[in-house]
Curated annotation (Swiss-Prot):
Residues binding K(+), per UniProt: 236, 255, 257, 260
Domain TrmE-type G: 226-389
Assembly and binders: Homodimer. Heterotetramer of two MnmE and two MnmG subunits.
CDD domains: trmE, TrmE_N
InterPro entries according to UniProt: G_TrmE (IPR031168), GTP-bd (IPR006073), GTP-bd_TrmE_N (IPR018948), GTPase_MnmE (IPR004520), MnmE_dom2 (IPR027368), MnmE_helical (IPR025867), P-loop_NTPase (IPR027417), Small_GTP-bd (IPR005225)
Keywords: Cytoplasm, GTP-binding, Hydrolase, Magnesium, Metal-binding, Nucleotide-binding, Potassium, tRNA processing
Cofactor: K(+)
Protein name stated in the entry: tRNA modification GTPase MnmE
Natural source organism: Burkholderia mallei (strain ATCC 23344)
Task of the protein: Exhibits a very high intrinsic GTPase hydrolysis rate. Involved in the addition of a carboxymethylaminomethyl (cmnm) group at the wobble position (U34) of certain tRNAs, forming tRNA-cmnm(5)s(2)U34.
One Pfam match: MMR_HSR1
Compartments in which it is found: Cytoplasm
Cofactor note: Binds 1 potassium ion per subunit.
Enzyme class: hydrolase
Amino acid sequence: MLATDSDPIVAIATASGRGGIGVVRLSLGRAGEAAARALSDALCGARLMPRHASYVPFLDGAGEPLDRGIALYFPAPHSYTGEHVIELQGHGGPIVLQLLLQRCLDAGRAHGLRLAEPGEFTRRAFLNDKLDLAQAEAVADLIEASTEAAARSAGRSLDGAFSRDIHALVDDVIALRMLVEATLDFPEEEIDFLEAADARGKLAHIRERLAHVLGDARQGALLREGLSVVLAGQPNVGKSSLLNALAGAELAIVTPIAGTTRDKVAQTIQIEGIPLHIIDTAGLRETEDEVEKIGIARTWGEIERADVVLHLLDARSGLGPGDEAIAARFPDGVPVVRVLNKTDLTGAPASVTRTGGGAARADVCEVRLSAKRGDGIDLLRGELLRIAGWQAGAESVYLARERHLIALRAAQAHLARAAEHAEQNAQALDLFAEELRLAQERLNSITGEFTSDDLLGVIFSRFCIGK
């Protein structure tokens, strides 16, 4: 534990700006009950009763009221952080909150009270076993959720749904490890522990459950991160019109003049709760205009970072030499949707054709639509969801992060190797046991049983101050 993890800390816990209510939160660490009594007297002029709401004045150093509000005292360990906690709930003006914060620091100086770092309250909740690491991350995800679906999924993670699934997997792996260790520890016995206990069947069951958890986690990661979708193509094929149609608002300027869009225009929309970060880019062509060249260079940068590329073509001319040259530069591994726009000028109906694209672009499809009239926009939305791998109506989804997916995939790989060793019977039992141990270690890293201080620092530094 870091030396600073036991310092008394204080921070404004509500968002900056004006509001009806503002909260200053103190977690008293090693200073404990003595500091709670002293600060209650100094700040509120009264001894606060545990778990009672007291309407009191908040006093300055001269004993004059700065504000009046609700004071709450939660003795350890029955608090958010597991330490003695005081919350002062007053009016949400930025000046009065800063005055109250400074008053807390002055009154608590003798106890070593300092300003909290970002995420430090939740870090202490984790260190004091009030939350595991996945639940702690869910606190930040709930605050930052950009859609209702993301908020509900973060709530499920905070409630422990993700952690319970991980703990169940770990328990199963531990039980299987015990069987393997028993066989290794008693090689002279004629009993085949693995065969008698159906170890291979148990391993198959664990792998099946892990695949299900990974599927839910992928869905949750989609809700959290969303999908970056770049509109690319030659000038004047309707990229800005398509952005406006997808967003349902006039965000980009649309003119018949080629090269109108010289820099990216970005907008986040929602489809079934998934944030789609749509990026309209400069038209791709040879040009001598220096400003347009900069925009085109930025377009290729956005394409390199995209999750999906929408390659727009004019439905009247289809795929021409210029379009083929553009398509040849798209990075491998990035799904490309070929969008033939302006079907209102050809009379062709809106449609979807799944074309495939080889191993590198297995999700490639072709959508014919009219961004101007809105024909086929729903078809395009459906294809984006399909490419993302979204399964509508998934009630068990919990929000997940990239580090969770990495750990789950690593555990999956270790269990796959364990299955290979299990087929070799006694000749590879030690390797079987080691792969199970490594799988358990990767699963435990999700909930924080085996986690370095460096990783904790990165995770909690991304929280807001006061949480």
